């Protein structure tokens, strides 16, 4: 079965097994990968895991995601846990889709955590 993934969607993924401090378990993940790669059915996908273990004022390491559609709990995006996963780890979705205004905040947080200078 071919997944029809879209940039900015949130899907449920099985992130086990893990190593060290990696986020594990079955949990929602934000699809961060470029839409052209998704459309080409690339076998892996760049994601950001979510957690319901909320921490206040933790930007840029975390961004709060409000419940919507089938994402039923308030969550934090774990910006410092960005990783690529095999598409076989994606098990259900989309749970919801993030609006462009929120994704702009995600891009800024990712750039800051990764040390990209967007001002240049």
PLM-predicted stretches and their roles:
Residues 22-26, 30-67:
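Compact nucleic-acid interaction/catalytic patches
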Residues 3, 67-120:
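C-terminal terminal-subdomain/extension
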Residues 1-3, 54-55:
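Short linear motifs in intrinsically disordered
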Residues 16-20:
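Short, charged beta-turn/beta-strand-edge "cap" motif at the junction between a beta-strand
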């Amino acid at each position: 079965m071919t997944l029809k993934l879209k940039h900015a969607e949130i899907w449920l993924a099985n992130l086990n097994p893990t190593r060290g401090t990696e986020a594990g378990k079955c949990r929602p993940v934000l699809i961060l990968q470029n839409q052209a790669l998704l459309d080409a059915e690339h076998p892996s996908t760049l994601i950001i895991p979510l957690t319901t273990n909320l921490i206040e004022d933790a930007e840029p390491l975390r961004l709060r995601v409000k419940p919507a559609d089938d994402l039923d709990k308030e969550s934090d995006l774990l910006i410092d846990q960005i990783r690529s996963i095999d598409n076989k780890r994606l098990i259900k979705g989309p749970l919801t889709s993030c609006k462009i205004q929120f994704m702009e905040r995600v891009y800024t947080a990712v750039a800051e955590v990764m040390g990209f200078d967007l001002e240049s």
